[in-house]
Regions:
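ATP-dependent carboxylate/acyl-activation modules
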Residues: 1-65, 73-101, 105-243
Length: 243
């Protein structure tokens, strides 16, 4: 779905842009400013955001299709503005239930070591409910901050995305649908509980249970332990394999 950039709290903007968004079935970015400019307070920006959401719903646009941008101001010029942006973002997320977006790099304009400031601000904003950060994806420290946040906040289940991004080890071969020793080995190694259970159940139709344990399951778990010690796999993968 396209995202139209953008509408703001000014009456002319609301009356012109929102009907187009509804007509073409798009989503829309709502800027927390109006004819008076950008409010200095979180309360002021929240009220504009609320106005945008209510007007959007009045023309039949679901609030889940409205991305509110609480606007990032340069901290070197207006240091208090950072907290106001974050507070407004939090209120939009919790009280209006909207998705949020925010440009990140403007926060550090005029400061040395801009990347450090940007990364820290990004993490603070995500903690307050930021959904769509506008960042340069080619800056590894920024994408890395997003990945780490997703792990720490329980979004990246079992840290799989993080591990795949930073683990140089070659992954084990995918499980095939044939009933062979390799299938059970790969299922255990990769922590594929359902596939491993199915392969084991099928093999038990023709093979003694102790033979399956001693010749297939134990060697697979041994390999998992060895690769964990060599830092080829990591704790979430070890736990999945054990399960």
């Amino acid at each position: 779905k396209p995202i139209l950039n953008s509408v703001n709290g000014e009456e002319q903007s609301l009356a012109t842009v929102l009907p187009l968004v509804k007509k073409y079935g798009a989503s829309v970015v709502g800027l927390a400013l109006d004819e008076n400019g950008i409010p200095k307070t979180a309360e002021g920006r929240f009220e504009i955001a609320k106005r945008i959401v209510e007007r959007a719903e009045a023309v039949g646009i679901d609030r889940k299709d409205v991305y509110i941008d609480c606007l990032t101001l340069t901290v070197s010029a207006e240091q208090a503005a950072c907290r106001q942006t974050l507070e407004a973002l939090h209120r939009v997320k919790t009280e209006l239930g909207c998705k949020t977006c925010l440009g990140v790099s403007n926060i550090s304009f005029g400061l040395p070591n801009r990347e450090l400031v940007n990364r820290t601000f990004l993490t603070m904003a995500m903690e307050q409910g930021l959904d769509l950060p506008i960042i340069n994806p080619n800056v590894e420290s920024m994408t890395g901050a997003v990945r780490a946040f997703r792990v720490l906040n329980g979004i990246d289940k079992n840290s799989l995305e993080f591990i795949n991004a930073y683990n140089d080890a070659v992954p084990a071969a995918p499980v095939k649908k044939a009933d062979s020793n390799v299938d059970i080995f790969a299922a255990v190694y990769n922590g594929l509980k359902n596939e491993g259970a199915a392969a084991t159940a099928k093999l038990l139709e023709t093979t003694d249970a102790m033979q399956v344990v001693n010749e297939m399951l134990i060697p697979a778990l041994d390999r998992v332990g060895e690769d964990f010690e060599k830092n080829k796999i990591f704790l979430p993968q070890l736990i999945q394999s054990a399960n």
